Amino acid sequence: MDGAVRGQGCVGRLRSFNKTKKKNRNCSDDMRNGDDEEKKYSHHDMKNNLRNDANEEKRKSSDDMRDGDFEEKKKCSRHDMKKNLRNDANEEKRKSSDDMRDGDDEEKKCSRQDMKKNLRNDADEEKRKSSDDMRDGDDEEKKKRSRHDMKKNSRNDADEEKRKRKRKCSDDLKKSVVNDASKEATSHSDWRKNRKAGSDAEQRGKKLLNGDKKAKSRKVTTPFFEKMRKIKMQRTSNQNGEKNMKSDGDSYKKTVPLSVNKGKMEKDGTNKRTLSNTLVAKERKMRPSDSMEMKMKKKKRDASFVQPDERTAQTFSTKNKEKKRKAPSTPLKREQKERVASSDNKKETKKACIVAIGNEKKNCRDGKKKKRKAAFAFFKFVRDEFEELLFIPPAVAPSLKDLIDRHVYLEDSEGKCSKIRLSVVDGSLAFYEGWNSFVSEHCIKWGEFLLFEYTPESTFSVRVFGIDSCERLHFSVKSGGKGAVKKRKERHTLSDDLISHYNGQYQDSEDIHDGPNVSGESPRSKEPKITVDAEIGTRNLVAKSINAASETQDSERVESGIGYGSLGALGNKVRNLSNGECDTRSDSVFCIQEKTRRSEVIIISDEAYSTQVDEDTMKQTAPSEASEIHHVTINTQKDLERVVDGVCCESSVALNNKMGNLILGEPKNKNISPACSTEKTNGSEITPTTGVIPLTQENIDTVKLNTLSCFEEDRSTTRESELAAAIPTTSETHDSDKDLGQKHQRNSVQVNSIIAVDKYPNDSEMNISGNIFRIYEAPAGTRCLEKWKRGIVNGRAALDDIGQVRPEKTQKAGEKLVGNCGAMGESPVDLRIESDVTDTCLKPILNIPIEELSILDSVSISKCGRSRTEVNHLFNQKGATVQLQTKKEPLKPTGSSGNRKGDKIAVSVNRVFAHQSELQIPQQENGNFTSCVTPVALLPAKAELLDLDDHSLQFCIPSTIQKWLELPKSLPITCRQKGRYDRNVVILKDPMRRLWPVFYHDKPVFVGFTAGWKPFAAANNLQAGDVCKFVKEMDEDELAFQVYITRK
């Protein structure tokens, strides 16, 4: 029961449980439904809440953002404000800096403008101040510009010639290309017709290309012409190919075009060398380019290898045979022919080449055509300094650039030629070497007009027009004709005795006037002779200078017989004399003709010609009392020596290092010893007025005085009429001599001459050489120098001990002569010394030959007055000095003695050599001279010019020679002569008398020479240790210094 109950209970429980379960299910459904609704509502609320919350959050965040943005904006605004403030400050600073800069720029601009103005003003001031001083510099700049222009013109001419040649070559090439193209077309057609005969064509091609046995011609390697040739040939081949393409068809395609390279042809399968008869091989061998090149080569050879004879025949041939012109025969051609005939080594080598023109063969000379210049003309007026050179106009100079440093020929109206060298002097082209001889031969004077016409082969035709505007067809001085000798003999005929004496001595020698004597082309002779013609009178003495030129135109000497002049050698060739028709040669005869009441003729003969007299004898003859002719024969021992003659203060030029004796006097038909001779004639005792006493020694250590003289020509035409005038008395002669001396003071020249030591116990006369014009009263009568001619000594010496000499500068009246003149005063010294006719003695004049060299330091003449004269000679040799002192008792001057300053006159003698310890000086005892050996003490002496310390500067060249030279002290230049205080242009005269403009600076930092010093040092070969001495020349017009150089 319990179990049932229990079972029932379980069931009930289950039922209740199920019921409860159903209830719960229903409740749960209800709850679910309610929950669903609630959930729906809660979901909606939750969404709304969420939205609200989100909105609220957004609002809050937006508010927060707004607050943050505001704060950030505030911060940003503050930052921007700061930035703006900074930018504003920076902008203000920039503006202020820009303003400051602008102000500084304006100030700088103002300062720059002021500086530029100041610089311009300073530059203008310097230009104004240095314009006068820099004239030489401006001339040099002009010369440089002219050189630059000449170079430009020459370059332009060369470029123009090159262009013309290129144009001609291109035109010839075009013509040849056209002709070759036409010939090529015909050759192509013929070749196609005959292509079966390949071997024959090959042989013909080989003959065409190589000739018979000639090497293949080279191809034109110029890329421009090669390209042009290919283009032309391609065009012509294309034109011809279009015409022949229709007929030939496939055969044309087999040919190789011109533009095919060798590499492309070699890429073919077959070997072209083995297939000699193939079309390709034939085409290669018969290419038109090769044939065209051969033809071009032939044409060029034809143009270049035409014989000159055929050329002249072609150019000068006309229809009329009479009008045929031959090539002119000029001196240059003749000289070239002689040169080729004389030397086998200078023969022109000719190369013969055979040029095939059709079937003919011509032999041609290998060389270029000689260009012939067209004839042109120019004229020149003869102005100052025309004796040495003549400048050619700059416009004409470029056309003569090929003749620079070559010889040309000047042909005058008489058909005579002179050989002259064209040289560049100071940047300009000029007639230089040989021009002086041309001037002297044709007597060209200042103011005349010369017309030059250039003809081919370096020849100029010269026409001379005088001052009267008329052409001079004949010239007074002729170079080697018989007519000139006849004219000379008509004017100055010698007496019968003199002619017989002359003919007797020289009858075996050839006539010295017969051969032609052209300047520069001297004929060779077996026996050289020198003859000098001059006319000397008691009133007038004309000493003509000799202006001659040797074969090389290097050596020229000045000769004069009596008067103030010199006797010297002119070289080993025949020379032309300016005073008449004479030929001068070395080792020769000096003949001086005189036509006067009492005239003297000095004949210096060679030992070979003089057989009638001894070495030391003098032969004098007098044909009549009215006209006495004195012959003095002097043996020169085959070489004329430096002879010092005392007649009218003469000097001489040495020919060699041997001694010659000259003694002149007036006894009749007597032989007089060279030492001394006195005789009574017509109640008076007459002694030779001139003598030369040699100074000898056992070892022949002797002293030699070097003398040079230059002459100034007096252009007065009244001198010629005085030659034929009557001879006045002695008093009249003195008056005329005084007037003549006053006239010659205007045209005086500095002269280097001998200081003659004269010693007279009987108060007679003393001869002092060194002045340009002197008048003496001698026993034979007063001899005065009347007419001088400038002796232009140009070039090197032909013989020993003769250096190059240039003419001195002409001194004006009132100028002081310093350096190589005889006296220092306001005018040249004019000494007129009187001697008693009844008692005269031989004047001892030193003739000193040379063995070893040294330099004369100074020669002074102190107390040159009427009461006493001292002559001191100081010779310096390696620290030793030879001092010769001669004292003289009162003199008797009869004329003006010249102006002197103070009691001393300083004399400078250039190039005096000394080496002797004992001198042999003759002395007079009882009317006869005896020679005695007088020892001369070697005393130390300073090398300086006396009384010229304020006008000289001596220094030693430094160890290094540069473009500039620093001087130990300032040069003696007065402020009045300066163009500017600190710098100036100074003229330096070297020992050869050449002028050198040099820039001189005188500043606290530097004193010395800059521009111009280097060429001066190079030309004079200055070395370290040489001593230079600058002596100021007393010339107010320019700053000039004579430079004496002592080698170390």
From Swiss-Prot:
One of its GO terms (molecular function) is DNA binding. PROSITE patterns: B3 (PS50863). Residues 16-25 have a biased composition (Basic residues). Residues 26-134, 151-162, 169-214, 243-253, 281-295, 332-345 have a biased composition (Basic and acidic residues). Its main location: nucleus. Keywords: DNA-binding, Nucleus, Repeat, Transcription, Transcription regulation. It is found in: Nucleus. SUPFAM superfamilies: DNA-binding pseudobarrel domain. Residues 1-345, 505-528 are annotated as: Disordered. CDD domains: B3_DNA (cd10017). Residues 375-468, 953-1048 bind DNA. InterPro entries: B3_DNA-bd (IPR003340), DNA-bd_pseudobarrel_sf (IPR015300), REM16-like (IPR044837). One of its GO terms (cellular component) is nucleus. This is B3 domain-containing protein Os02g0598200. It comes from Oryza sativa subsp. japonica. The lineage of its organism: Eukaryota, Viridiplantae, Streptophyta, Embryophyta, Tracheophyta.
